[in-house]
Amino acid sequence: MSEINAGFAPAETDVAASGDDLLGRTLDRIPFSVYHLLLVVILGLVGFVEGYDTAITGALLVLARGPLHLTAADTPWLVVVPTAAVVASVFVGSLLNDRFSRKNLMQFGIVVTTLFTLLIPLAETADQLIALRILGSIGVGFAIPAAYPIGAELLPAQHRRTFATIYELVLATAFVLLPFLGFLLAHNPDGFRLIALPGGLALFVVPVLVHFIVPQSPRWQLSRGRAGAAAATVNWMIARAGGAIAALDPAVLTRGPARASAALPPYAALFRAGQLRFTIVGVLCGVSSTVAYYIFAFLLPRALEAQGAAVSLSFGLSSLLFLATLPGKVLVGFLMEAIGRRWTILFALLGAVPGLLLMAIAHLTGNLAAIVFSIGALITGMTVLSSFPATRMYLSEQFPTALRGRGHFLGETVARLLGGVVAPFLLAPYIGSPVIFFGSVLIVVAIGALPPLLYGKETVGQLEGVARTGAPAGAPSA
């Protein structure tokens, strides 16, 4: 535990604190206020956009099958290809991030995603639906990975778990809402049109709130040599939070290394000695949970139907699985500060093994199958599907400010490529086999639990240490 608590040690021991330290220290000293809570909720709505865009795939596979005459050949086009578009756009975003405003990239992505979701009710053929899903998925790649670097850089150290937890809770509501709406609309021929409206209508709400409530990241502004803009942003946040501390003098932010060119380190810096180990660990920590996330969001309703469940029951069990993530993410949010990111990730991933086993063998229990599956779904929902507050924040904390956006986007690219493209493509032919379907997820989750604990370092409260050293504070060079 001393390793964890060391992350909260003040930086005043520095002989001459740099501008990065002073800015970070000032942000951490702003008392948590209604403004901070509003900021967290607005970023959480971005999570709703992500959750709705992902979870709607499973609903569309069922609800649009009759009205649009979807065939088995259309499944990869609705599941794999849009996710491949997300991966491609995340990678493009990783090249642009750190160089351009995280907020502006996020706004672009939100508008594109919600616009094409809003157009889904107009689809008259399977090809039109597929095209809209692919175009909307391009926006997801720009919007979603930006939220965690922004949250990590705006929130005081002790409240980053607050952001991560609320963000993931709002995201989880989309996964609970979609199967529930699918259950209600299961026999409505226009069900696939109606179910797209909540995600599409967010176009008129979320971008407006982000524009007026979420500031540019002052840490990013300072990393680009804009000390005056960084100080102005911090002082704006101080005023919005009640003005409880003194304003920040822009002059103090020029301390430390010269920023004449404000040149960014190259993308290759993510793989240099001293950073490579933490890049790999940060990327790997989210892959297992992302595989489970996408498999269940995309294929679970269809898999349960293929395994003999009624359409309404398949939606009901899927909704139960994601409903369990609401208390699960609160628990993970508490644990990630109490016992650290790494031990929390281990708990969340290994804790899912019993639940996945129960879901895999539920079909063997006769009349008790629904009960056994429900127990397994509750366990799995409260563990691996609730791990994202820890895994995503841990990923963002692996990188210094000048690499954070690109590093986080890289992690999201790899996780979504493996979880949202490769895994569904490989498992889609076997959705009728409970042992193969759930057993494959179990193996991936069990293997992925160990790298952060064995090779990673604790990062709680060490964002400025990462900014100085390029690796989590106290970590030896690779």
Summary of predicted features, one role per range:
Residues 90-101, 329-341:
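Helix-to-loop junctions at the C-terminal end of transmembrane segments
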Residues 69, 101, 122-128, 156, ...:
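Helix-breaking motifs and short loop linkers at transmembrane-helix boundaries and internal kinks
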Residues 57-58, 271-329:
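Extracytoplasmic gate region of multi-pass secondary transporters
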Residues 88-126:
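Conserved MFS/SLC helix-loop-helix module at the cytosolic interface between two early adjacent transmembrane helices
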Residues 340-391:
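C-terminal transmembrane helical hairpin of 12-TM major facilitator-type secondary transporters
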Residues 1-29, 211-274, 462-478:
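Intracellular cytosolic loops and amphipathic helices of Major Facilitator Superfamily
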Residues 161-187, 197, 201-203, 412-422:
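Glycine-rich segments within core transmembrane alpha-helices of 12-TM secondary carriers
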